[in-house]
């Protein structure tokens, strides 16, 4: 059973949450957060998906849509523009604060996909008081910088994701991700512009100049699990995912490559690591086990040291 919930956010936001599973007494409370050019459907494909799987394992699961996505308001293309600052400073904090009030005695896990993991990290860096309620993070195909890959990969990122999408956005007033085959949901021009700037350069806010990388240095980051598909060459390359884990500093982290023949029955890309039915046998159990282990108060942290870019390039994958 899926229960729809509305959560109020600043600047006129009305966010859709979908709850699966009964309110738990001991199981993990899990928020699922989509990324750019996507929405909550990535966690809820027909008759399967990560949201349903985790609910069946005893988790209380909340699937979110940020403004401009799904049925949340304001909608994309309406009179009110969708800006990155709304997502980071209004929507994500509103969701976390609502969950904290709904489950005051339980700690929260957040599972993010793609750019959703970077948005979540930025929101937490801006409002570090929210970190106290978070028990752990699962990052699926999440990276900030886009440096890895060969010539074709770099061409696809710069020309299709970058230049062509930006030109189309200027004409249409939105990034037509669906018609361009870039995603399952059209995207805000401002959100896309900020993502492009972040993947090519410094992690700095384009509106007020807030330096996320500098502010991050004083924070203790939550335990995190990072997964990347071996066929994800453009949006979540393993080397870029690992680089993002290092960027977040010294913390309890596992970085895992989902690779055919090494624990997985098939190759996985950026989206089908969530939507393919076989994921329920390949790596969804890994996610559920990680959540259960990190919820235990006796869990011992394994620190993931900060390394240079050269160290990241030559590092062995943790599998």
Briefly describe each language-model feature range.
Residues 233-239:
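Conserved alpha/beta-hydrolase "acid-adjacent" motif
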Residues 226-228:
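Short beta-strand/loop motif that positions the catalytic acidic residue
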Residues 1-22:
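N-terminal cap/lid segment of alpha/beta-hydrolase-fold proteins
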Residues 105, 111, 115-203:
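Alpha/beta-hydrolase-fold enzymes
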Residues 23-70, 74-75:
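Short, surface-exposed "cap/lid" segments of acyl-processing enzymes
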Residues 81-100:
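Alpha/beta-hydrolase active-site loop
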Residues 65-69, 143, 261:
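Short beta-to-alpha linker loops that shape the active-site pocket of alpha/beta-hydrolase fold enzymes
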Residues 254-319:
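Catalytic active-site module of serine/aspartate enzymes centered on a nucleophile-bearing elbow/loop
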């Amino acid at each position: 059973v899926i229960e729809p919930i509305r959560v109020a956010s600043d600047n006129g936001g009305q966010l859709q949450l979908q709850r699966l599973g009964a309110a738990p007494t001991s199981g993990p409370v899990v928020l699922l957060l989509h990324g750019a050019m996507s929405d909550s459907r990535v966690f809820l494909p027909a008759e399967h998906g990560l949201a349903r799987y985790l609910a069946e394992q005893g988790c209380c699961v909340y699937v979110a849509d940020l403004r401009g996505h799904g049925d949340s308001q304001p909608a994309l293309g309406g009179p009110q523009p969708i800006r990155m600052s709304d997502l980071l400073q209004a929507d994500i904090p509103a969701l976390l604060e609502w969950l904290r009030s709904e489950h005051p005695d339980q700690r929260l896990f957040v599972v993010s996909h793609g750019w959703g993991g970077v948005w979540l990290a930025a929101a937490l860096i801006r409002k570090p008081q929210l970190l106290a309620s978070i028990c752990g993070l699962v990052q699926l195909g999440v990276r900030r910088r886009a440096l890895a890959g060969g010539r074709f990969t770099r061409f696809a990122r710069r020309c299709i994701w970058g230049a062509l999408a930006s030109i189309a956005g200027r004409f249409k007033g939105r990034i037509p991700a669906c018609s361009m085959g870039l995603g399952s949901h059209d995207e805000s021009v401002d959100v896309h512009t900020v993502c492009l700037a972040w993947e090519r350069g410094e992690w700095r806010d384009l509106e007020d100049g807030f330096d996320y990388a500098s502010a991050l240095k004083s924070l203790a980051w939550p335990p995190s699990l990072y997964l990347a598909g071996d066929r994800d060459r453009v949006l979540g390359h393993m080397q870029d995912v690992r680089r993002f884990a290092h960027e977040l500093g010294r913390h309890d982290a596992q970085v895992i490559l989902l690779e055919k023949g090494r624990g997985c029955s098939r190759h996985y890309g950026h989206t089908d690591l969530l939507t393919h039915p076989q994921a329920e046998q390949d790596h969804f159990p890994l996610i559920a086990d990680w959540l259960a282990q990190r919820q235990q108060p006796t869990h011992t942290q394994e620190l993931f040291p900060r390394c240079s870019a050269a160290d990241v390039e030559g590092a062995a994958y943790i599998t």
